[in-house]
Amino acid sequence: MAAALQVLPRLARAPLHPLLWRGSVARLASSMALAEQARQLFESAVGAVLPGPMLHRALSLDPGGRQLKVRDRNFQLRQNLYLVGFGKAVLGMAAAAEELLGQHLVQGVISVPKGIRAAMERAGKQEMLLKPHSRVQVFEGAEDNLPDRDALRAALAIQQLAEGLTADDLLLVLISGGGSALLPAPIPPVTLEEKQTLTRLLAARGATIQELNTIRKALSQLKGGGLAQAAYPAQVVSLILSDVVGDPVEVIASGPTVASSHNVQDCLHILNRYGLRAALPRSVKTVLSRADSDPHGPHTCGHVLNVIIGSNVLALAEAQRQAEALGYQAVVLSAAMQGDVKSMAQFYGLLAHVARTRLTPSMAGASVEEDAQLHELAAELQIPDLQLEEALETMAWGRGPVCLLAGGEPTVQLQGSGRGGRNQELALRVGAELRRWPLGPIDVLFLSGGTDGQDGPTEAAGAWVTPELASQAAAEGLDIATFLAHNDSHTFFCCLQGGAHLLHTGMTGTNVMDTHLLFLRPR
């Protein structure tokens, strides 16, 4: 926690307006104590889904080291283990797998983001790196998370390895978010450029992510169960780190080891809907015309075991345990927070106000209208399994400090050229919302952080705020509305109190979306 404590000197040096001095020192100390606890909980959430712990929970060897157990399945090991992987977190996953199973590993190929090895070396995260003479070949590509020639070479190497396997072999597949861009393998004669152009045109005309994935799978050799088909008749164990709300295995990295449920008619329907069927390249028409109704039929995936080994749910569960150990009543609201960042910020701001009335009954309570508005915002966000009533009841009966936890990914409509990410923007918007409501004798802190350690094109993972944010910003001449209008949340937090509110972790080597923490502590 040394890094977290470094913010104390910066805050001590930060200018305080004379009118704000009375009581500011006490509130500052309280905020810093909450901020330190928030960082602890965030780090515990990330720690629960780091590659090493995840792989060791998912895999185990018998005492003789000749049998691999995955869930309730056993696989014989006799120098027959092969490994492939693709995704932003796969380098560390492969390193953990090599540490556990290296003596049985014959060959491996992984596709990871460009520059990730150097970044891990700079961060001193040796546990995320393969051994010097590893049997796993590493390809770096997909710069800026876009398919490119380097990623294509990696995908073809993965395909070649899979196609050479026999019924006696076992293929371990490591998958994480970002895997789709790192596994581009168009069906010939379609080229990578033609496939990219088509998906860009569809996106520009309003196609949904589900529709885009349907087209990608239909034109790919490896997506939509294609990798599983290539590896047949070998046994396939797919270990998946989910960065998608709800953990749908067919969506994560476009489901290379999950049979596609879509057919050519689905593709043609999508292309017709967006007026692109007539303008298709000849190569795309050729592939679609010769494809079977179900190119990677379900029968090809009976030899596959797909296992989610890490998710936002697991990360939040660990943070909840840590919060309870610190004396908080902790409730997980949802691991599927999604929707517009403005609406989400309004929800968290109003939730803090309504929660305050439950924790401090002597204060004026939330009006019926405010209570109804909170539920309307929740309905607008369409959050599945939202535990809002449980959270409010916990506060009404407990009367102690409360920590509300959530995870997911809000969406941000870009309207400016500033620097930031969805976590810093959400935190800034929540900070602006908190000033709208009288919170009384209660300390409130909100933190939003990306579990991969990188929020947008910045070096911060996220940020934390308190109800004093608006007055702190005004004291330093910072106009919150102006920064939000330009999506410039990172610049704002860099300027505010010397960057003390930024959450810095460095690249974590994992990714299970974002973590939101709302602390409410009666004084």
Swiss-Prot record:
Q: What is its EC number?
A: 2.7.1.31
Question: What happens upon changing F493C?
Answer: In D-GA; the mutant protein is not expressed and has no enzymatic activity
Q: Known Gene3D superfamilies for this protein?
A: Glycerate kinase, MOFRL-like N-terminal domain (3.40.50.10180), MOFRL domain (3.40.1480.10)
Q: Any idea which GO molecular function terms this record carries?
A: ATP binding; glycerate kinase activity
Q: What keywords sit in the KW lines?
A: ATP-binding, Cytoplasm, Disease variant, Kinase, Mitochondrion, Nucleotide-binding, Phosphoprotein, Transferase
Q: Which residues carry this modification: Phosphoserine?
A: S60
Q: Which Pfam families match?
A: DUF4147, MOFRL
| Any single GO BP term | fructose catabolic process to hydroxyacetone phosphate and glyceraldehyde-3-phosphate
Q: Which reaction does it catalyse?
A: (R)-glycerate + ATP = (2R)-3-phosphoglycerate + ADP + H(+)
SUPFAM superfamilies reported for this sequence: GckA/TtuD-like (SSF82544)
Please tell me whether the keyword Transcription is annotated for this protein. no
Implicated disorder: D-glyceric aciduria: A rare metabolic disease characterized by chronic metabolic acidosis and a highly variable clinical phenotype. Clinical features range from an encephalopathic presentation with seizures, microcephaly, severe intellectual disability and early death, to milder manifestations with only speech delay or even normal development.
Query: Which family is this sequence assigned to?
Result: Belongs to the glycerate kinase type-2 family.
**Protein name per its UniProtKB record:** Glycerate kinase
Which species?
Homo sapiens
